[in-house]
């Protein structure tokens, strides 16, 4: 297996223009495909998850042109749901942002579809979404294990009416149903069962739907009403915001070993909840400055904090490695959904943090981290999880090197991450 050893970094300084957001890129691609008219998407993320979505759209008869650097995509919208005259199998890798929304969108049209992916995808639950789609009349069967992909869909359209969605595991199930709902056969009401996790990701979905001409009534995240007779219409141009989760590594690096780092492509008006990572860093002692389309982080004396991170689960992982540089104990709470991401992130983070010397308590939905006096050089296993690889790069901001196994797994969201980090780093 390939590995990369990062030597100790004395200081970080500079500016990073963020790659496009994965969450925004795949939502916008899907809506552009369903919309009437042509959409020009700019700052699209070039990564595995986006490629899986684009490959699926090609198989579904969508025409698009991708620029040489793959960050501009012109999509000719179908102006209707997807149809297939012969059975189509779509391989979606480990891309939850493609699997869940496509599972819902494919129920709208006509045809037979099989959705499958990598072995890890077959361990990521989808039952709550399938239950809701079945309530709306969808014909879906599990081809291997109950509640998990691969799925076989016999599409005949989605009925109007009320459906129930369990919101306690992942907000992607609700996102998927919301995006399909305007093309159902009438008004749709979605009732949320349990406490909805990761609400800011729902805000992203609603914001993008609005840009494509669809209004949704949001009753305090307990009920969503999608009035009948709406359809998606291209906004013409669509700018994909920088990935706020990806910003977290650079903002944290500056807080630990700045100088200062300016991150561009997101700002105080960002639609992504993960920009609130900067607020958590500020609470820990970093100096943060907000602009319209940038955030600056400067070094501070960091102290451990005890916080609920349900609203920013992806960026919260970065807090776990930032905690290695803070005085005292850091508690990351209410992040059960780490367990159903690219890997079981609670277990993985606890295991790898202990390797570098931290004392860690892993609970069902929390992590408590006590930093060591001195970090230990370790080979970090990344579990084919892009965020674990990027989080643990921060260990090099000490006087200890760190080895990252399978560093190319960052291609899921940030293919040139390690090059970017190196360009901002002054080695010890």
UniProtKB/Swiss-Prot annotation:
Family annotation (SUPFAM superfamilies): EPT/RTPC-like
Active-site annotation: 314 (proton acceptor)
Binding site for phosphoenolpyruvate: 22, 96, 124, 172, 345, 387, 412
CDD domains on file: EPSP_synthase
Alphabetical UniProt keywords: Amino-acid biosynthesis, Aromatic amino acid biosynthesis, Cytoplasm, Transferase
GO biological process: amino acid biosynthetic process; aromatic amino acid family biosynthetic process; chorismate biosynthetic process
Record's catalysed reaction(s): 3-phosphoshikimate + phosphoenolpyruvate = 5-O-(1-carboxyvinyl)-3-phosphoshikimate + phosphate
Cellular location(s): Cytoplasm
Pathway(s) it belongs to: Metabolic intermediate biosynthesis; chorismate biosynthesis; chorismate from D-erythrose 4-phosphate and phosphoenolpyruvate: step 6/7
Binding site for 3-phosphoshikimate: 22-23, 27, 170-172, 198, 314, 337, 341
Main location: cytoplasm
CC terms in the record's Gene Ontology section: cytoplasm
EC code: 2.5.1.19
InterPro entries referenced in this protein's UniProt entry, alphabetically: Enolpyruvate_Tfrase_dom, Enolpyruvate_Tfrase_sf, EPSP_synthase, EPSP_synthase_CS, RNA3'P_cycl/enolpyr_Trfase_a/b
Subunit structure: Monomer.
Similarity-based family: Belongs to the EPSP synthase family.
Biological function: Catalyzes the transfer of the enolpyruvyl moiety of phosphoenolpyruvate (PEP) to the 5-hydroxyl of shikimate-3-phosphate (S3P) to produce enolpyruvyl shikimate-3-phosphate and inorganic phosphate.
NCBIfam families: aroA
Descriptive protein name: 3-phosphoshikimate 1-carboxyvinyltransferase
Species annotation: Vibrio vulnificus (strain YJ016)
């Amino acid at each position: 297996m390939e590995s990369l050893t990062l030597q100790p970094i004395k200081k970080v300084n500079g500016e990073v223009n963020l790659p496009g957001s994965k969450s925004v890129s795949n939502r916008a691609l899907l809506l552009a495909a369903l919309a009437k008219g042509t959409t020009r998407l700019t700052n699209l993320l070039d990564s595995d998850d986006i490629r899986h979505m684009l490959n699926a759209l090609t198989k579904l008869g969508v025409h698009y042109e991708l620029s040489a650097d793959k960050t501009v995509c012109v999509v000719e919208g179908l102006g209707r749901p997807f149809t297939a005259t012969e059975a189509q199998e779509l391989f979606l890798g480990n891309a939850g942002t493609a699997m869940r929304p496509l599972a819902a969108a494919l129920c709208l049209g006509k045809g037979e579809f099989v959705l499958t992916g990598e072995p890890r995808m077959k361990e990521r639950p989808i039952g709550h979404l399938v239950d809701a789609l079945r309530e709306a009349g969808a014909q879906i069967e599990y081809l291997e294990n109950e509640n998990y992909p691969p799925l076989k869909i016999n599409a005949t359209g989605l009925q109007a009416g009320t459906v129930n969605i369990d919101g306690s595991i992942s907000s992607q199930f609700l996102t998927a149903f919301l995006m399909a709902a305007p093309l159902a056969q009438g008004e749709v009401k979605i009732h949320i069962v349990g406490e909805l996790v990761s609400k800011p990701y729902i805000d992203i979905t609603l914001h993008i739907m609005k840009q494509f001409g669809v209004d949704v009534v949001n009753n305090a995240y307990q009920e969503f009403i999608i009035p009948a007779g709406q359809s998606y219409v291209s906004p013409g141009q669509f700018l994909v915001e920088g990935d706020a989760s990806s910003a977290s590594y650079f903002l944290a690096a500056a807080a630990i070993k700045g100088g200062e780092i300016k991150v561009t492509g997101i700002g105080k008006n960002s639609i992504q909840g993960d920009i609130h990572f900067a607020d958590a860093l500020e609470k820990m002692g970093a100096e943060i400055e907000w602009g319209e389309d940038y955030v600056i982080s400067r070094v501070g004396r960091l102290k451990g904090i005890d916080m609920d991170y349900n609203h920013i689960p992806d960026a919260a992982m970065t807090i776990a490695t930032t905690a290695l540089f803070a005085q005292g104990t850091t508690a990351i709470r209410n992040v059960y959904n780490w367990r159903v991401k690219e890997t079981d992130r609670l277990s993985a983070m606890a295991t790898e943090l202990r390797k570098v010397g931290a004392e860690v308590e892993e609970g069902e939905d929390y992590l408590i981290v006590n930093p060591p006096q001195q970090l230990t050089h370790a080979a970090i296993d990344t579990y084919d999880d892009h965020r674990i690889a990027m989080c643990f790069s921060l260990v090099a901001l000490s006087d200890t090197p760190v080895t990252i196994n399978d560093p190319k797994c960052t291609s899921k969201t940030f293919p040139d991450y390690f090059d970017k980090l190196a360009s901002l780093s002054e080695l010890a």
